[in-house]
Amino acid sequence: MANVVVVGSQWGDEGKGKIVDWLSERADVVVRFQGGHNAGHTLVVDGKVYKLSLLPSGVVRQGKLSIIGNGVVFDPHAFVAEVAKLKAQGVEVTPDRLKIAENTALILSLHRELDGFREDAASNSGTKIGTTRRGIGPAYEDKVGRRAVRVMDLADLETLPLKVDRLLTHHNALRRGLGHGEVTHDAIMAELTSVADEILPYMDRVWKILDDKRRAGERILFEGAQGTLLDIDHGTYPFVTSSNTVAGQAAAGSGVGPGAIGYVLGITKAYTTRVGEGPFPTEQKNEIGEFLGTRGHEFGVVTGRKRRCGWFDAVLVRQAVAVNGIKGIALTKLDVLDGLDEIKVCTGYRLDGEMIDYLPASQGAQARVEPVYETLEGWKGTTAGARSWNDLPAQAVKYVRYIEELIGAPVALLSTSPERDDTILVTDPFQD
């Protein structure tokens, strides 16, 4: 039996929500290990739609333990709001069903404000990253800068004021430099103490809980957010998120050893999308892009932003397979391609007249690569709702097999609609 890490193999929005929900029914524990409330996912359980951005997907299922690991940056006010929203939908998130790592760094209002100040300034200079303005990056900066306020600090009101002072020394200098007013000590203390009683009951030693669960033979699902190409090290820097999104982060971001991870599942969309700024070699700024966006309902769960759309890029996914150690992929949204006369797949790049089979690390080179396509015949039948290979048109099967060949990883799961049961299981990741 394997513990499973789920990661996005593209720029996020690959359909992880449905796959994680599908897997969470088989898991005993579901863990978030990086990111914050900037990455939304939609779950459909028993006909009810749940939209989550911070909480692990396991919270909507009875009998599952959900964990927010130390690799997450945690907005306490967003947490309280999301818990209240779920309660209104009939889901009680209680401390016996959810644990938050005691050493998790907090996102405060000053982080959100700084995020917005920088994006506004960057917009004027043409260097905008396209963040969600939710304070994710500034919170990670404070964590690395060793001045973050962490969950455990809410329980120690004697030392908390000193930590707030240290944080404000840094932030108020930044705010003055950006032409904004300072934040007062009392304002931040009030912000923290107002939510402390709602957060502290969930606080625990997550590393110990996970070690006990692992030794007891329970199934652990590690739920990644965003995608590989948004990784702070391995993504299209600087147009990335502020955390490591690759599978290796599951260990560091939760407190388990890497040996506890048995299977890495890469969620992979049958075409490619991206939100925000940055390079996108196969982007289609034409009727194909509009078709994919409309058919695929490509709008962000958190921001509502329209996603950029393009053909499947095997170069990027092949690189993601290598960087993550992906054993199998869950191919999603195949049904969006139904009805196209022809479908293109990027098999390589041309850079300054030479053929390459990887994405360069240089920002300048990333902007210059030209996709090299192979054109496949489309299919007239429908893949929507298919639950076995026999239900798929022959050309759709050919497309899937071609992708497997190009990326060097097999399809473990194939999703054919947003409904969780419309899934073709080839390999159960937990049985690896």
Curated annotation (Swiss-Prot):
Mg(2+) binds at D13, G40. GO terms for molecular function: adenylosuccinate synthase activity; GTP binding; magnesium ion binding. It catalyses: IMP + L-aspartate + GTP = N(6)-(1,2-dicarboxyethyl)-AMP + GDP + phosphate + 2 H(+). GO terms for cellular component: cytoplasm. GTP binds at residues 12-18, 40-42, 307, 333-335, 415-417. Its EC number is 6.3.4.4. The active site is at D13, H41. Plays an important role in the de novo pathway of purine nucleotide biosynthesis. Catalyzes the first committed step in the biosynthesis of AMP from IMP. This is Adenylosuccinate synthetase. It comes from Mesorhizobium japonicum (strain LMG 29417 / CECT 9101 / MAFF 303099). The lineage of its organism: Bacteria, Pseudomonadati, Pseudomonadota, Alphaproteobacteria, Hyphomicrobiales. The gene is purA.
